Swiss-Prot record:
Belongs to the UPF0179 family. It holds the Pfam family UPF0179. This is UPF0179 protein MTH_609. InterPro entries: UPF0179.
Amino acid sequence: MITLIGEKLARKGSMFLFCGPAEKCRDCRFQPTCIAPLEEGRVYHINEVKDRYQRCPIHLGERVRVVDVEKANIEVLIDSKRAFEGSVISFEFPDCDVECSMRDLCFPEGVMEGDRCRIVKNLGKPGKQCPAGNELRRVLLRPLDKK
């Protein structure tokens, strides 16, 4: 999908988390191209940076670049019984209140409860045991578009 991003951030292969539009964006003439295609709370991967520029008051008078993006693959921890490459799952956050070093992978940014996701790659066991006793696997998920 095509969107706009600050010139300093527009690098092929980089990723960004869309946190929602600034107040000034709501009435901007570029809003349909810039923010309308993006979902708040999603992580996007920049596939291509185009040679097109626009001025943007949000980026301190700097320019924004036209970029081609897609939803990024997200590294997560899931139950080992569901970790089959190529399968489509409904993502669920674990029922866990334990604060541990792996919590960011169990509750990752960019994927939401109930999202349909494809398991792109099974990365194997995490480096540590789950303190809550869950049998987990590290996987790369790709959130799928809603149908």
